[in-house]
């Protein structure tokens, strides 16, 4: 069985999505499937026909980061980088809900993503900053 993770990385050269545990435990391979966070290592490719798949490559570019990526950079939300793409995708899905961004709600949203470097504080701060920017931006009205 081919996994979504394999097709993204090997066939489509979308290597931002990381392979971690291969068992759906670490979240390094988190992508959006019809707007919901899924672990690409657990999704058979045959189940994604007709769906919308979002990867970290779709958030922004090296020259033009999106607001969430910029907040991660500004707040030191990435260290070794292994968890960062999955964290960004989980955070993006959370922010898209419009739910109030509290420490607890952010931590719950990223609970499926493990980070061994940061202790999560900087990640939570980055997501909160991006949420506030979106809340006050003309592009993201209340």
Residue ranges of predicted features:
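Signature of N-terminal electron-transfer/Fe-S-associated modules in redox systems
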Residues: 1-142
């Amino acid at each position: 069985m081919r996994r979504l993770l394999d097709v993204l990385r090997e066939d489509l050269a979308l290597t931002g999505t990381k392979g971690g545990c291969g068992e759906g435990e670490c979240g390094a391979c988190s992508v959006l499937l019809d707007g919901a966070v899924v672990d690409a290592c657990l999704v058979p490719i045959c189940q994604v026909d007709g769906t919308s798949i979002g990867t970290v490559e779709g958030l922004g570019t090296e020259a033009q980061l999106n607001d969430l990526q910029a907040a991660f950079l500004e707040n030191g939300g990435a260290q070794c980088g292994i968890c960062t793409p999955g964290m960004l995708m989980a955070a993006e899905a959370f922010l898209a809900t419009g739910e109030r961004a509290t420490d607890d709600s952010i931590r719950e949203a990223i609970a499926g993503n493990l980070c061994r470097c940061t202790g999560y504080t900087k990640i939570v701060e980055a997501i909160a900053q991006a949420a506030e920017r979106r809340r006050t931006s003309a592009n993201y009205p209340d």
